[in-house]
C-alpha cells in the first residue's frame, strides 16, 4: 500500500476534449517490482492527448487520464529496477511498456518503440492479463515500467524537458537516424509544437542549413529566432515550390493534415532525398502520391514513431549539453481543461506544460 492517491483529470467520453475532463481518483496498473511510481511535477500537453480524449485515432477505453510528457520525482522503485533510485528526477514519454522478451527483435535491439507484441502506451492502453489500464500525467502520480523511465540530466529544467519526452523525441529520432548533420540541408514542415523541436535539434546536430516550412509568413520571425536559416511560407509565397525545388537533403514533416501538399513537399528534395512523416491525422490518411513523382527523382518516403528509451536519454543529454530550451508556456494543472482548449485553438508558442503546484 502507498500513502498517496492516484488522482488526475479524467476524460469519461469524447466530450472531454471540449474542456470537460473531471478530476477524480483512478486505479493504476497493479504494482510489480519492475515499476516506478512518479510524483508528477510537470506534464506537457501533446496533440496526442486531444486525439485520444476524442477517440480520434482509435476507441479510447474511458475513463482516461492523458499526458505522456511527464517529469517528476521517483517515490517508489521496484526491486528489479536498476537505473532509477528513489528521489531521482525522472521522465516518461509516450510508451509505458513493451513485451521486453529476449526473442523480440525490436526489444532486444533498442527499438522498444516498434515492438508489436506487447506495446503499452503511457495512457489509454489496457495491460495484458489483469494488470489494469495505463493512466497518464495530468495527475498527481504515475506508475510506469522502469525500463521506460529516464533520468533528467542536470542543467535541463523540468518544464523544458517535459515536452521533449514526446514532442522532442518524435523529431529528434528521425533527424538523427536519417543523417541530419554537417553537410546536410534539412527542412522542417510545420513549425508548431513538434516543428520547433525539429529546428532546434537539426541545428544542434550540426546541419549546414535548416529551413522552416509553414503556411503563414507571420511565423517567420519566430522560426528564424529558433535558429532556422531560411523560411518558406506556403500560403503566402506563390512560387515557393518552384523557387525552392531540389534544395533539401531531408525533410521531416510534422503536419497532421490529409490535405497537405505532399507532392510539392517532395519536390523540395534533391535527387535521392528523404521525407519522413511524423504527423498523423485522425484516420491516418495522407494525400495520394503519383508513382512518377517518386521514380523521377529517386525520392524515399518513410515514417517514424516516438523513440526508444535510449533515444530519449541521448536527446536529453544533447539538450543539456547544447543548452537547448523548449519554447513553452506553463499553466497550472488545475487549468488543464482551458489549456487543452487553447492548445486546440493553436495558441501555444509552442508547447504548454502543466505544472502540478503541489509537487513543483
Question: What are these language model-derived features?
Answer:
Residues 89, 185, 273-274, 300:
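Short glycine-centered segments of the SAM/dcSAM-binding site in methyltransferase folds
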Residues 215-222, 284-291, 311-312:
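Short, glycine/polar-rich helix-capping loops at beta-to-alpha or helix-loop-helix junctions
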Residues 182-191, 196, 203-263:
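Adenosine-nucleotide cofactor-binding segment
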Residues 1-4, 263-264, 309-360:
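C-terminal hydrophobic helical "lid"/dimerization subdomain
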Residues 269-271:
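Helix-to-beta-strand junctions that scaffold the AdoMet/dcAdoMet cofactor pocket
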Residues 27-43, 56-108, 113, 135, ...:
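Glycine-rich beta-strand-centered segment in the early N-terminal region that forms part
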Residues 98-189:
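NAD(P)H dinucleotide-binding glycine-rich loop of Rossmann-like/cofactor-binding domains
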Residues 274-276, 288-329:
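Rossmann-fold dehydrogenase core element
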Amino acid at each position: 500500500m502507498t500513502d498517496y492517491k492516484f488522482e488526475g483529470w479524467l476524460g469519461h467520453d469524447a466530450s472531454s476534449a471540449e474542456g470537460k475532463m473531471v478530476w477524480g481518483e483512478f486505479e493504476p496498473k497493479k504494482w510489480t517490482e519492475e515499476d516506478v511510481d512518479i510524483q508528477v511535477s510537470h506534464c506537457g500537453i501533446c496533440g496526442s492527448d486531444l486525439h485520444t480524449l476524442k477517440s480520434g485515432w482509435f476507441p479510447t477505453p474511458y475513463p482516461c487520464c492523458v499526458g505522456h510528457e511527464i517529469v517528476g520525482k521517483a517515490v517508489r522503485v521496484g526491486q528489479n529496477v536498476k537505473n532509477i533510485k528513489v528521489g531521482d528526477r525522472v521522465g516518461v514519454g509516450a510508451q509505458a511498456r513493451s513485451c521486453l522478451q529476449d526473442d523480440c527483435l525490436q526489444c532486444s535491439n533498442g527499438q522498444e518503440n516498434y515492438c508489436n507484441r506487447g506495446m503499452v502506451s503511457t495512457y489509454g492502453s489496457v495491460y495484458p492479463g489483469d494488470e489494469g489500464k495505463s493512466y497518464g500525467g495530468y495527475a498527481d502520480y504515475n506508475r510506469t515500467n522502469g525500463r521506460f523511465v529516464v533520468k533528467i540530466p542536470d542543467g535541463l529544467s523540468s518544464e523544458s524537458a517535459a515536452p521533449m519526452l514526446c514532442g522532442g523525441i518524435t523529431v529528434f529520432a528521425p533527424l538523427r537516424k536519417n543523417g541530419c548533420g554537417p553537410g546536410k540541408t534539412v527542412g522542417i514542415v510545420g513549425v508548431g509544437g513538434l516543428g520547433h523541436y525539429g529546428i532546434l535539434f537539426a541545428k544542434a546536430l550540426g546541419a549546414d542549413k535548416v529551413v522552416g516550412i509553414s503556411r503563414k509568413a507571420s511565423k517567420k520571425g519566430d522560426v528564424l529566432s529558433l535558429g532556422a536559416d531560411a523560411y518558406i511560407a506556403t500560403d503566402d509565397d506563390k512560387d515557393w515550390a518552384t523557387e525552392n525545388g531540389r534544395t533539401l537533403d531531408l525533410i521531416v514533416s510534422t503536419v497532421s493534415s490529409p490535405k497537405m501538399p505532399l507532392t510539392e513537399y517532395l519536390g523540395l528534395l534533391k535527387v535521392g532525398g528523404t521525407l519522413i512523416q511524423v504527423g498523423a491525422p485522425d484516420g491516418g490518411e495522407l494525400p495520394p502520391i503519383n508513382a512518377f513523382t517518386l521514380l523521377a527523382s529517386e525520392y524515399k518516403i518513410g515514417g517514424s514513431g516516438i523513440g526508444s528509451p535510449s533515444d530519449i536519454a541521448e536527446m536529453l543529454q544533447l539538450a543539456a549539453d547544447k543548452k537547448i530550451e523548449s519554447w513553452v508556456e506553463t499553466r497550472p494543472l488545475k487549468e488543464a481543461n482551458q489549456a487543452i482548449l487553447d492548445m486546440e485553438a493553436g495558441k501555444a508558442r509552442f508547447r504548454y506544460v502543466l505544472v502540478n503546484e503541489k509537487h513543483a
